A protein has these predicted regions:
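Basic, low-complexity terminal or inter-domain segments flanking catalytic cores
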Residues: 1-117
Length: 117
């Protein structure tokens, strides 16, 4: 596992907001999940529609694991890697890495099922 990988990754809503919306951890009725802050009325303009984009903890862990594996494989091969523009989809969730430095990996995610609601 890559050291501090959880702290390096920042996840943002990929639902085309004017400004970046970093996902926030939420306590759901049955489990913890990450959601777009634009879901809550206090974080949006009155005419703005609520954003339902969210990701479960299981899917979040999968995302971290995927990124970690890519970095580990490159490290094992002794080859430098930059994951900027790397895209993948799993369970109707699209991921794209838009920034990759030694300190930060910025990921935009879009849950196609949640956004339809």
């Amino acid at each position: 596992m890559i050291k501090n990988i959880w702290n390096m990754i920042e996840v943002y809503c990929g639902n085309n907001h004017k400004e970046d919306q970093k996902l926030e951890i939420q306590n759901g009725m049955y489990q913890i999940f990450y959601a777009c802050p634009k879901y809550h009325i206090e974080n949006r303009n009155p005419e703005e529609r609520a954003c339902n984009n969210r990701i479960s903890m299981d899917d979040y862990e999968y995302m971290v694991s995927t990124i970690s594996k890519l970095l580990e494989d490159a490290e094992m091969d002794n080859s430098p890697i930059n994951l900027k523009n790397y895209k993948w989809t799993k369970k109707n969730i699209e991921y794209i890495i838009t920034e990759h430095t030694n300190e930060k990996i910025k990921v935009y995610m879009r849950n196609k099922v949640a956004i339809k609601k």
